From Swiss-Prot:
EC nos: 6.3.4.19
Descriptive protein name: tRNA(Ile)-lysidine synthase
Organism the protein comes from: Rickettsia massiliae (strain Mtu5)
Alphabetized UniProt keyword annotations: ATP-binding, Cytoplasm, Ligase, Nucleotide-binding, tRNA processing
Localization per record: Cytoplasm
Length: 477
C-alpha cells in the first residue's frame, strides 16, 4: 500500500531525531495534496505537530483558490496553515529560478521562526527521472546527474519522502479517497523542455536525448563539439570509474526503467565514493577565514579526482561570493587548467578574485562588481552581502552596514591596525578590507568590527562569517 511505502521512507530519512513538529510544503497539485494526507496520518500516529505551508507566487489567478483550498484541508485536519506570498516585483526574467529560490527563502525563514528543523516536499519518482534527463542534456558531470532525498536550505533539512513513488500512484490514492486537487495549466505547455520529457514518459514512450537545439543547451550555445569536450574532460573520469552511463544514456534512448536504474547507480557512486572524498578534500585542503576569504592548499588538492576538484572550486566560489548558484563548468575548467601549469596567476570568476600564490590558491570577494547594498541596523542583527551577520550590542541610532569606500579608507587609514589581516591574507589585506562590513552613521565610519576599529569606546558590534551555503552534497551549520 502507498502509506506503508511512505511510512518506510520517511522513517528512514528522518531517523531517530525525536522531532515534536515538522513542516510540509503544499501547493494544491496532486503530488503535494497526497503528501499532506499521508504526512497527516504519519504525524498523528507519531504524535507530531504538522505545520502546512503554502506559497502564492502571484502569477496565476488560480493560485488564490489553491491556497484557500489548502487552508480548508488544513483546518479539517486540525493542522496550522501558513500562507506566504512571493513578490516577483514585475520582473519576469529567469522567473522560474527566482520563484523557486524565493519560495524556499520564505518557507525556511518561517521554519526558523517556528523552531522547525524539517520541511517535507512532494518530489516524486517522475520528478527525479525528469531532472536526470534535463541534466543529461546539459552534459552534467556525475555530481550534477546525482539526486538526493535529503537536502539543506537555510539550515533547514528538506526531506523528500515520495522519491520512489510514481505520480500515478499518488493520483490513484487521491481518486480512491475522493480528494480533489488543482492542475497547473503551465504543466501542459510545450514551452518547457521538462514538460516535453514528462509527456513522453507519461505515455510510456522512451526518452530520446535532445542534442540539437541550443535553447536547451544554453551554457554551450549549441556548440556540440565544445560541450562534448567539456563533458569528457572531467565528467567522464568519474562516469567510467563505475561504468555509470550506458551508451544509450550518453547518445541514444532510454526507457523510464533504464533512467531510474542509471540514477540509482549514479547515486550509489556519489554516496559511497565521491561524497566522502569531497568531504575529506574540504577538510584537508580548504581554510576559510572569518574575514570572508579562503585558501586552497594545491598540493593536497592535486590528489583528488577531477570531479571533486570542480566541486571544491564551486564550493569556495559560492561561499566567498555570497551567491546561491554555482558557476558553470565551462567557467571553472580554465581555472583547473591554470592550476596544472604551476605558475602564479590572478583571475576573476563568479564575483571572486582567484589568485595563485605559490602552492596556495587565495579566493576573496571581488570589490567593485555588484557591490552589496547598504543595510540599516534596525533590528539587533542583520545579514549583509549574504555572507556576514552583524549584531549590535547597544542602541545605536541611524546606523547602517555598508562597505568601505576608497575615500573612507584614506580618511581613517592611519588609525587602522591591519597587521593581523596582512599576515593571514599573504599581504592582500587592502583588497580584502574593502569587502568587509563597516558601520556608519551618516557619512562617518564608526566601526569596522573585523579589525577592532571603533571611533568611540561606546560602540560594540559583533560580526561573523555566515554565508547561506546550499549544497546537495555537504552541509555545515
Amino acid at each position: 500500500m502507498l502509506y506503508e511505502k511512505f511510512e518506510y521512507n520517511i522513517n528512514n530519512l528522518i531517523g531517530n531525531f525525536g522531532l515534536s513538529k515538522i513542516s510540509i510544503a503544499v501547493s494544491g497539485g496532486s503530488d503535494s495534496v497526497a503528501l499532506l494526507y499521508l504526512a497527516n496520518i504519519w504525524a498523528e500516529k507519531n504524535n507530531i505537530e504538522l505545520f502546512v505551508i503554502s506559497v502564492d507566487h502571484n502569477l496565476r489567478e488560480q493560485s488564490k483558490q489553491e491556497t484557500h483550498y489548502i487552508q480548508n484541508i488544513s483546518n479539517s485536519l486540525n493542522r496550522k496553515h501558513y500562507s506566504l506570498s512571493f513578490d516577483h516585483q514585475n520582473n519576469f526574467s529567469n522567473l522560474q529560478e527566482r520563484a523557486r529560490e524565493g519560495r524556499y527563502d520564505l518557507m525556511t525563514n518561517l521554519c526558523l521562526e517556528l523552531d522547525i528543523l524539517v520541511l517535507l516536499t512532494a518530489h516524486h519518482e517522475d520528478d527525479y527521472v525528469e531532472n536526470f534527463c534535463l541534466r543529461l542534456e546539459r552534459n552534467s558531470g556525475i555530481f550534477g546527474l546525482s539526486s538526493s532525498n535529503i537536502n539543506w536550505y537555510n539550515n533547514i533539512q528538506i526531506i523528500r519522502p515520495l522519491y520512489n513513488i510514481p505520480k500515478s500512484e499518488l493520483v490513484e490514492y487521491l481518486v480512491s479517497h475522493n480528494i480533489k486537487w488543482f492542475e497547473d495549466e503551465s504543466n501542459s505547455s510545450d514551452k518547457y523542455r521538462r514538460n516535453v520529457i514528462r509527456q513522453k514518459l507519461a505515455k510510456g514512450a522512451d526518452y530520446i536525448r535532445h542534442r540539437s537545439k541550443p535553447a536547451y543547451r544554453e551554457e554551450f550555445k549549441g556548440d556540440t563539439e565544445r560541450s562534448t569536450a567539456a563533458y569528457t574532460s572531467v565528467g567522464e573520469e568519474a562516469l567510467l570509474r563505475g561504468s555509470i552511463l550506458s551508451l544509450e544514456a550518453k547518445f541514444g534512448t532510454m526507457s523510464k526503467a533504464a533512467i531510474i536504474s542509471q540514477q540509482l547507480k549514479t547515486n550509489k557512486l556519489i554516496e559511497n565514493e565521491l561524497k566522502p572524498e569531497l568531504i575529506s578534500a574540504i577538510a584537508e585542503a580548504v581554510k576559510i577565514f572569518e574575514y570572508g576569504f579562503a585558501f586552497l592548499d594545491l598540493v593536497k588538492f592535486d590528489k583528488f579526482s577531477n570531479e571533486v576538484k570542480v566541486q571544491i572550486i564551486n564550493f569556495l566560489l559560492i561561499i566567498i561570493s555570497g551567491q546561491s548558484r554555482a558557476a558553470r563548468f565551462y567557467s571553472v575548467e580554465p581555472i583547473l587548467k591554470l592550476i596544472t601549469q604551476d605558475v602564479n596567476f590572478k583571475n576573476t570568476l563568479h564575483g571572486c578574485i582567484i589568485k595563485r600564490i605559490q602552492n596556495e590558491l587565495l579566493i576573496y570577494r571581488e570589490f567593485g562588481k555588484k557591490l552589496p547594498e547598504s543595510k540599516i541596523l534596525l533590528d539587533k542583527s542583520v545579514i549583509w552581502d549574504n555572507r556576514f551577520c552583524i549584531t549590535k550590542n547597544q542602541e545605536t541610532p541611524n546606523c547602517f552596514v555598508t562597505h568601505l569606500s576608497l575615500e573612507d579608507y584614506k580618511i581613517i587609514k592611519k588609525q587602522l591596525d591591519l597587521e593581523p589581516l596582512k599576515n593571514l591574507s599573504c599581504k592582500n589585506h587592502n583588497a580584502v578590507l574593502l569587502t568587509l562590513p563597516i558601520i556608519k552613521i551618516l557619512e562617518k565610519v564608526i566601526a569596522i568590527p573585523h579589525i577592532s576599529y571603533y571611533d568611540n569606546d561606546m560602540w560594540n558590534f559583533e560580526v561573523s562569517f555566515a554565508p547561506n551555503f546550499v549544497s546537495r552534497f555537504t552541509h555545515f551549520c
